[in-house]
Amino acid sequence: MKAYQREFIEFALEKQVLKFGEFTLKSGRKSPYFFNAGLFNTGRDLARLGRFYAAALADSGIEFDVLFGPAYKGIPIATTTAVALADHHDIDTPYCFNRKEAKDHGEGGNLVGSALEGRIMLVDDVITAGTAIRESMEIIQANGADLAGVLVAIDRQEKGKGELSAIQEVERDFACAVISIVSLSDLITFLEEKGDAAEHLDAVKAYRAQYGI
């Protein structure tokens, strides 16, 4: 695990974005942890969050031309990631996001920001069912662009309805890399390093044994 990944987990715990306990997911599964990126909700939080997304992008080595943030949660993520790439990596990246409802006056259309062209890096908080990615792919393809990759904050590394995770299904269906700032494996490593989180560690390991990929 890299330093920025460890720092991200500490940041998420500090902001209560990441919690350990018992949580019922939409799927009905009882999860020993929960991640709610909506709690990164101040200017300083967003600035820090962007630096972690930018670090993961730089670490990945994936080449792309435009950052795309799907409405609504992806919008601030794309914005802060673009700022962090400029400020900390000297990379001036165009960014773009979509409107949920197309506008029929002013500049019109359903895209705001840069033109959606070339190789697109989609940024979002998590992938649960892959629905948002599929909707975004329709927009990307309609503009004649290609999906270079997808970056999310956390990869839960758990099966969906079949044997694959939602992320693996996206990788299979769209032939692109899906990367994350951290994964379930990183959370386990973090808990092991802490040494005083045996209760949470056992619960997370048991969950991975049941649902992990």
Curated annotation (Swiss-Prot):
What this protein needs as a cofactor is: Mg(2+)
Signal peptide start and end residues? none
Which EC number(s) does UniProt give?
Answer: 2.4.2.10
Report the Gene3D superfamilies cross-referenced here.
3.40.50.2020
- Residues at which 5-phospho-alpha-D-ribose 1-diphosphate binds: 26, 72-73, 99-100, 103, 105, 124-132
Quote the InterPro entries the UniProt record gives.
OPRT (IPR023031), Or_phspho_trans_dom (IPR004467), PRibTrfase_dom (IPR000836), PRTase-like (IPR029057)
Q: What keywords is this UniProt entry annotated with?
A: Glycosyltransferase, Magnesium, Pyrimidine biosynthesis, Transferase
Keyword Transferase in record: yes
Q: Which pathway does the UniProt entry assign to this protein?
A: Pyrimidine metabolism; UMP biosynthesis via de novo pathway; UMP from orotate: step 1/2
Q: Which reaction does it catalyse?
A: orotidine 5'-phosphate + diphosphate = orotate + 5-phospho-alpha-D-ribose 1-diphosphate
Which Gene Ontology CC terms are recorded? cytoplasm
Q: Detail the disulphide connectivity of this chain as listed in its UniProt entry.
A: none
Q: How does it assemble?
A: Homodimer.
Q: Which family does it belong to?
A: Belongs to the purine/pyrimidine phosphoribosyltransferase family. PyrE subfamily.
Function statement? Catalyzes the transfer of a ribosyl phosphate group from 5-phosphoribose 1-diphosphate to orotate, leading to the formation of orotidine monophosphate (OMP).
Among NCBIfam families, the record links this protein to: pyrE
Protein name as catalogued: Orotate phosphoribosyltransferase
Report the source organism. Answer: Vibrio vulnificus (strain CMCP6)
Its lineage reads: Bacteria, Pseudomonadati, Pseudomonadota, Gammaproteobacteria, Vibrionales
